[in-house]
């Protein structure tokens, strides 16, 4: 039920929620050419980013952190908690990343099992998703 006194707050909430997006950037740990990746990423990133969400690993995750700094955007990192989840920690971390994001931008390579896991989770949650092969 929306009461007339709450309409302004609701409109503000909806405009913030859909105009500003938390974008998850996930991908291969073997990526090594930041400048080439940055050119690709800047060509596909939405303009209305409020935050970058990533996993704190090497490769694309490190690129995402660097790009967030260069763009002056906040970075939210979910690192795997091996003490709590053991070998399944990266998959739990992927769930946390996807849950926190409005939009998922994935950069898989041939061996990107974790990236494909995040892609599957984003699809299952009907998240906005863009997959760019490296």
Language-model segments: which ranges?
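Acidic/glycine-enriched connector segments
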Residues: 22, 29-134
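Serine residues within intrinsically disordered or low-complexity segments
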Residues: 4-5, 15
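Generic low-complexity, intrinsically disordered sequence content enriched
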Residues: 14-18, 71
């Amino acid at each position: 039920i929306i009461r007339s006194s709450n309409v302004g707050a609701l409109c503000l909430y909806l405009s913030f929620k859909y105009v500003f997006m938390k974008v998850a950037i996930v991908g291969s740990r073997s990526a090594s050419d930041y400048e080439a990746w940055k050119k690709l990423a800047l060509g596909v990133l939405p303009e209305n980013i409020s935050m970058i969400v990533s996993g704190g690993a090497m490769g694309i995750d490190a690129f995402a952190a660097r790009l967030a700094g260069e763009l002056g955007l906040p970075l939210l990192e979910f690192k795997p908690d091996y003490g709590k989840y053991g070998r399944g920690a990266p998959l739990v971390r992927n769930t946390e990343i996807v849950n926190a994001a409005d939009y998922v931008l994935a950069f898989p390579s041939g061996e990107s099992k974790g990236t494909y896991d995040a892609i599957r989770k984003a699809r299952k949650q009907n998240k906005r998703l863009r997959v760019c092969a490296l």
